[in-house]
Structure formats: structure tokens, C-alpha cells
Amino acid sequence: MDQRLSVMRIAAMTHSGHVRTNNEDCIGITDWIRTAPMMSPIVIECYVDEARLCVIADGLGGHVGGEVASVLTVRELSTAASGFTGPESVMTVLQGVNKRLYDVMEASPQSTGMGATVVGLAVVGSNVCIFNVGDCRAYVSVGGYLRLLSTDDSVGGAMADSSDRTGLHTHGILQSIGGLKSFRPVDPHLVNRVAEPGERYLLCSDGLTDMLDLNAIEACLTADPKLSVDRLVQAALEAGGLDNISVIIVDMFCNPH
């Protein structure tokens, strides 16, 4: 794909849900970052004339500083995004973000144990690099059906493969950015793909996939990414909204002009 003609149309939304008193999810699109609950999706359209990033971080529930950890994770990734050159640089940055969280914990003992799960999409030239740590998910739409690209770092995560139609997973996070009392290196999952016009990517926190199975998620998708994101969030709320809900949809296409 000629990156000079490549355009990303992105719709994104985060919501605290019906139960949580605060939103520990944070979403980012390059240098735009949001953690406050939203009433409707934002839509951003941009040329892929430089490295672009879409990311969701979910602060670990039951840990101190979940909201701080998710914002810090997104902010650090967003700051580094312009320097992404490929999967190796994404891996290095994620490992650095993990170390950064532990450095913050060491400097501020009251924040010990804070952490976040993360999923993101970095577009570098003609390639899309999908990355995740934890149980936030990334899908690609193929023929109208979603295929899982990320790998759950959770108990039962091995069962959540691309053929799993339940979309549901048990909890018990096996890996996160930060999240422990002392430093542990992180081993992010990376999938590198050649970007193609017409592709759609879906990023989401577990507040979506805990409420909706894959069939229900697919039923919410339309040609309009903003409407699709809104329908997904509303469906998760109607199903209970037990956790914070964050969704990003990325449509890739060529500029007709």
C-alpha cells in the first residue's frame, strides 16, 4: 500500500460503565489522550505520513493507582510513537514503559502494585503492528467476521483463539505493565501485518468482551466506524456495564484525491 495515499479513519470512546465509580481505562490516538467518560465517540481522520498510534490501557482493578498507571502507559507510548520504525522499536518502548512504572512505584511507595493491561496498533509505513500485554484485545475484520490478533495474558487465555465465538475469558492476569511489588520484565505479544485498504481493526478493553460474545460484537458493526463504536458501548452497557468500556475502530483506506 502506498503510504502517501493511506488514510486512517478512527472512532474511539471510553465509558466508566454502570458499576465503577471512576474510569481506569485510558485511550489514545497519537497525541490525543482521554480517560474521562465520553457521551459519544470521537472521530479522527489522518494521513499515514508518519508513524501513527491507537492504544487502550486498562488500569488493574483492585490495585492502587490503576487510573494513574493507565494514563502513564498511554502517555509514554504516545510520546514515543513518532519514533516507531517497526516491531522491534515497539517492543523496546513497551519494555521501557514497564520499567517506567516500576520506577514511579519505587519513587512513590504508596503507588506500589499499580499496573495496567494494554493493547495497541502502530502504523509504520505500509505495516501495522498490533501489540498487547494482558487481556485487552485486538481484532481484524475479515469478510465481515472478526479474527483475534492479540493473545490474552490471563487464566484460560490460551482458549481465546481466533475460532472462539464466545469471546469470553476468565480473569487472573498473568502479565501486565507494572502491577507487582517489584520489577518484572514484560514480554509483549506482537503481530506485524501489511496494511491493506479496506481493512478494519477493533481494539477494546475487557469491559466490552466480558459483556458481549463475538457474535454480538459483530452484530454491532456497520460501515460507519462512529456508529459502530457507539453501538458496541451501548450494547455492553445494556448487558450490564460491569466494568469500564473502551473501544477503538480503525478503518484503513486510500485517499481518492
Residue ranges of predicted features:
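PP2C/PPM-type serine/threonine phosphatase catalytic domain
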Residues: 1-257
